[in-house]
Amino acid sequence: MQIRTATAADLNDLARIYAAARRFMAENGNPTQWGDGRPTAAEIAETVEQGACLVGVDEHDVPHFAFSLYSEADPTYATIEGAWPNDAPYLTIHRVASDSVLHGVFAAIVAFARERAAAADVASVRVDTHEDNKPMQHLIAKAGFAYCGVIHLADGDPRLAYQLVL
């Protein structure tokens, strides 16, 4: 598996991947996180246009997972019910989704984020997830992230927030 920047040619595959992820979440006790059809096609296209959407592809360059990686400070992380280990610059992983074809997806994403962080001289990676997203919470903990507290999205929805200090 390889990770590359998504392009407009990947939009149909991205729609398929996010639909599969919504089904998986609903079937695993998390029907509300993306239950409203988010991220929308327009949100996905915008992330692709920004160059922040990445895809994991197989040997035929077919995307099977997607995520976004940002180097700018996330405004929703400015206030936390808890505490971040530090206030140093960080990368943020968002919108992790998979069609469940490939295995080791989150480990590959974290390895990729670590490489990007090292290249940018950034010493932390942050991620958040819904309280009902137990599979993701397990993967986050397994990858070595520390639970830091609760943040709130722009719409007020709470998310469990984690940081990996590199």
Feature locations, PLM:
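Conserved active-site alpha-helix within GNAT-family acetyltransferase domains
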Residues: 131-149
